[in-house]
Amino acid sequence: MSRYVFTSESVTEGHPDKICDQVSDAVLDALLAQDPASRVACETVVNTGLCMITGEVTSKAKVDFIHLVRDVIKEIGYSGARAGGFDANSCAVLVALDQQSPDIAQGVNEADDHAGDPLDLVGAGDQGIMFGYACNETPELMPLPISLAHRLARQLAEVRHNGTLDYLLPDGKTQVSVVYENDQPVAIDTILISTQHTAEVGGMSDEQGIRERITEDLWTHVVEPATADLNLKPSREGTKYLVNPTGKFVVGGPQGDAGLTGRKIIVDTYGGYARHGGGAFSGKDPTKVDRSAAYAARFVAKALVASGLAGRAEVQLSYAIGVAKPVSILVESFGTGTVSNEDLTALVQEHFDLRPGAIIENFGLRNLPQARGGRFYQNTAAYGHFGRNDLNLPWEDVAAKAEELRKA
């Protein structure tokens, strides 16, 4: 019997890197909502008293970027007396956006391998490799460690926003270690939560008293609600439980650490449980296969698991810049497939159109911000891009495709 412990982490929306992801995707949403053909590659950096957006944009949209950035920062919670050194109302906002390179644009605008099919006209925006993954550990077909870490991070933010724990501040991280036996989760080994808080908590200012209060509050208001519906639950007796191990966490957010778009790619995906091609998502329009093809790879992997063809599935796609068809497609089922990996790969090639133009059209990726009231991608920029039952994501809706695969 094989026994091991696997760990994944998540971060809250107030983490410096996640602020940047949300700002970059808010810029993307604003541009696509006005002009669905916008080409966007937006990077954000934050530090004490500063937020800068930079990158390349080609769009007919007219956006007040400074106002937009301030709104995102304020919504996250960095404003007013508790903002520290990073206040939405007073931080400097710098905008340094250029137009997309014409050398890149020509390959995306007209693919090298087009042959009359309109979907062949959209080439990949860059070369690269993308991975998608799914497994049967959770109802959303995600690995349990990252699923739990996201649950805790979202609940941590919720009790801050709704005032249940009014001493909490926006920055925070969660980490969950799960015990596996024969590749199946059997216990929750460790829960770690680091959360920013005010200098005084409940009238207390001593570090030990504050830490004990936060530890108890988080178990009651974060851990228990976040895991209430799970069959595999943590317990105070059997689960190691760590809160703010350094003792206190008062200085946080961009005042404590600089942030940058695209530095939480493992949090965004599968928590390290599956491989990653290296490309980040946020701030990139759908012609960037780093994003759209990673969504498609998840769709394929989830459909394979949902269909019963595999208990675990990892899908690798690769692309060449300016070429529509994938360079390669590979499926790995880790011995859980009802047929061989070669047969699974052949099924994918037959039943999924993985050209960038087809991915964009099938998921409606250019039109989603407009269709969802001006905001779509920003909602994916915190708490994961996959397994999100709260966001109605098109790449998570695999019921029809799974049925198609069952009949194949």
UniProtKB/Swiss-Prot annotation:
Pathways per UniProt: Amino-acid biosynthesis; S-adenosyl-L-methionine biosynthesis; S-adenosyl-L-methionine from L-methionine: step 1/1
Spell out the family assignment given in the record's similarity comment.
Answer: Belongs to the AdoMet synthase family.
UniProt remark on cofactor binding = Binds 2 divalent ions per subunit. Binds 1 potassium ion per subunit.
Residues recorded as binding L-methionine, renumbered to this chain, are E56, Q100, D257, K288
Give the location in the cell.
Cytoplasm
Q: Which residues bind ATP?
A: H15, D171, G172, K173, K248, F249, D257, R263, K264, A280, K284
Q: What is the lineage of its organism?
A: Bacteria, Bacillati, Cyanobacteriota, Cyanophyceae, Synechococcales
**Encoding gene (name):** metK
**Residues that hold Mg(2+) according to the record:** D17
Please give the Gene Ontology molecular function terms for this protein: ATP binding; magnesium ion binding; methionine adenosyltransferase activity
Protein name as annotated: S-adenosylmethionine synthase
Name the cofactor(s) required for activity, per the record.
Answer: Mg(2+); K(+)
Q: Which GO terms describe its biological process?
A: one-carbon metabolic process; S-adenosylmethionine biosynthetic process
The UniProt annotation puts the region (Flexible loop) at 100-110
Cellular component aspect of the GO annotation: cytoplasm
